[in-house]
């Protein structure tokens, strides 16, 4: 009976609790808007209209959710065994940089050979960026939260150096970006929109994450480590190996998001290829309680808020910061609910 109760709690009550906490966050934002003389119904209506009022808005929700799903998975996979990977932003830039090297160096290859190569380079770039803090955690006990966060700045600044120096387009009139990628290095777009092949990367990654977590020994051992690392060590589960494995897989997915951004949306590497996707993906993962299916839902929700924020600015004259406040309140309310539950347990 106890196991049945836990199953009901995990499959029914936890999603309902998450929805309730999210709704509470929207109520809190409404109260905040009322304090400043704004109608929250109008604000939410503008967000809804911006995201769903046209085919373009709906497609942009998906476009903005793609890197969020991949970066959220980069956080969630290590988090299931108790690791905090805050390095999604740097790992995304590392994957973008590796894919850029491939596009600029191997651009003469046919599309059928070049694109798979760029995908592999993006994965390897992100994995390499995650390997450094993972190795430090395994070999020296260095806190991965600090090391991944600090490494973000190193990698982002390295991208700045490359696009202002060795990779700078000589025809850019002194703008800091690389030459445009050849057509063979660009991902496909669909349905006359900016939705690109990165969507399939994200959905496949989320599906494999879900199946591996639920139906493989690898997923079972990760969950055991996350629940009780001491018991896992006594049972002979190799903790160090899983630290390296989960961090590198997570980094690879963030790197894949970077590859998709430069090979689809930007068609070149430039500063600011990410508008904080790595950090927002971290937020998405925590909002989703590190659950693969929850990641898809929350990434789409934040995509709606991001696209709808443009309409809030136009129709109500509210600053775009209003949307950031909504996201922040959702984050704090959901995390606050989890903390309260853990304290009372």
Where are these regions (language model features)?
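N-terminal, non-cleaved signal-anchor transmembrane helix
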Residues: 1-65, 80-81, 167-190, 339-345
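Cytosolic-side transmembrane-helix boundaries in multi-pass membrane proteins
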Residues: 1-24, 30-34, 227, 234-241, ...
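Hydrophobic core segments of alpha-helical transmembrane domains in multi-pass membrane transport
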Residues: 18-34, 71-76, 96-102, 123-128, ...
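Single transmembrane alpha-helix segments in multi-pass membrane proteins
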Residues: 31-36, 46-106, 119, 123-145, ...
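Short, non-helical or kinked segments that cap or interrupt transmembrane helices
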Residues: 37-42, 79-96, 138-147, 221, ...
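Transmembrane helix-bundle core of multi-pass membrane transporters
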Residues: 144-215
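Helix-loop-helix "hairpin" substructures at the membrane interface of multi-pass membrane proteins
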Residues: 192-268, 292-293, 297
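Transmembrane alpha-helical segments in multi-pass inner-membrane proteins
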Residues: 248, 254-328
């Amino acid at each position: 009976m106890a196991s049945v109760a836990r199953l009901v709690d995990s499959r029914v009550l936890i999603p309902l609790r998450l929805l309730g906490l999210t709704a509470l966050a929207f109520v809190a934002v409404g109260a905040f808007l009322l304090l400043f003389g704004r109608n929250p119904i109008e604000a939410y209506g503008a967000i809804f209209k911006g995201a769903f009022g046209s085919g373009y808005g709906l497609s942009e929700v998906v476009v903005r959710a793609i890197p969020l799903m991949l970066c959220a998975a980069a956080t969630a996979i290590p988090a299931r065994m108790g690791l905090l990977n805050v390095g999604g932003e740097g790992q995304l830039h590392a994957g973008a940089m590796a894919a850029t090297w491939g596009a600029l160096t191997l651009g003469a290859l046919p599309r059928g050979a070049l694109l798979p190569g760029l995908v592999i380079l993006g994965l390897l770039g992100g994995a390499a960026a995650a390997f450094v803090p993972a190795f430090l955690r395994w070999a020296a006990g260095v806190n991965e939260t600090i090391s991944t966060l600090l490494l973000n700045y190193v990698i982002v600044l390295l991208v700045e150096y490359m696009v202002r120096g060795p990779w700078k387009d000589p025809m850019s009139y002194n703008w800091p970006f690389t030459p445009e990628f050849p057509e063979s290095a660009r991902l496909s777009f669909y349905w006359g929109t900016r939705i690109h092949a990165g969507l399939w990367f994200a959905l496949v990654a989320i599906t494999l994450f879900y199946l591996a977590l639920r139906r493989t020994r690898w997923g079972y051992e990760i969950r055991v480590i996350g629940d009780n690392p001491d018991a896992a060590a006594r049972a002979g589960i190799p903790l160090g190996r899983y630290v390296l494995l989960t961090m590198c897989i997570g980094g690879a997915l963030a790197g894949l998001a970077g590859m998709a951004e430069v090979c689809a949306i930007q068609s070149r590497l430039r500063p600011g290829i990410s508008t904080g996707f790595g950090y927002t993906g971290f937020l998405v993962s925590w909002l989703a309680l590190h659950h693969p299916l929850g990641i898809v839902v929350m990434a789409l929700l934040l995509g709606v808020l991001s696209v709808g924020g443009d309409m809030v600015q136009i129709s109500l004259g509210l600053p775009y910061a209003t949307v950031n406040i909504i996201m922040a309140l959702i984050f704090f309310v959901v995390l606050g609910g989890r903390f309260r539950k853990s304290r009372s347990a």
